[in-house]
Amino acid sequence: MFKDLEKARPGTRRDLPAVLAALPWNAQGLLPAIAQQHDSGEVLMMAWMNREALEETLRTGRVCYYSRSRRSLWRKGESSGQVQRLVELRLDCDGDTLLLRVDQTGPACHTGRRSCFYNRLDGDGLEVIAAPEIDPETLYHR
């Protein structure tokens, strides 16, 4: 399906069941999902989605991921209150990566930072470039 879409004109559509069936889920039934703030373009985080998480996200408009460590659905913000509302969902050209354009409430990272990408790496090493907005102990009511 995705090879055919390379030559498709804008406005070309495919039904959701056909798209979901054509997605190249990995051996664990997952696809990488990148969350991006819809209005600024800031990359917030990368997580995983299985089919159930993707369908729930599309159905409800509230982002749901799949937690590999817990082996269960992870509804973003369920314990922290820092929810992601789906604005738009895109697929890359191969259909093997999801881009979720979201409206993020508060920090996206479990460390209390706005983005999980707060470590800059260059030829000299790693530098932390962002401070937490919220103490993680407060964020998760520990």
From Swiss-Prot:
One Pfam family matching this protein: PRA-CH
* Ligand binding (Mg(2+)): D92, D94, D96
On the tree of life, the source organism's domain of life is Bacteria
- Which class of enzymes does this protein belong to? hydrolase
Where does it sit, as one GO cellular component term? cytoplasm
What InterPro entries does the annotation carry?
A: PRA-CH, PRib_AMP_CycHydrolase_dom, PRib_AMP_CycHydrolase_sf
What's the chief localization of this chain?
cytoplasm
NCBIfam families, per database record:
PRK00051.1
Q: What is this protein called?
A: Phosphoribosyl-AMP cyclohydrolase
Species the sequence originates in: Alkalilimnicola ehrlichii (strain ATCC BAA-1101 / DSM 17681 / MLHE-1)
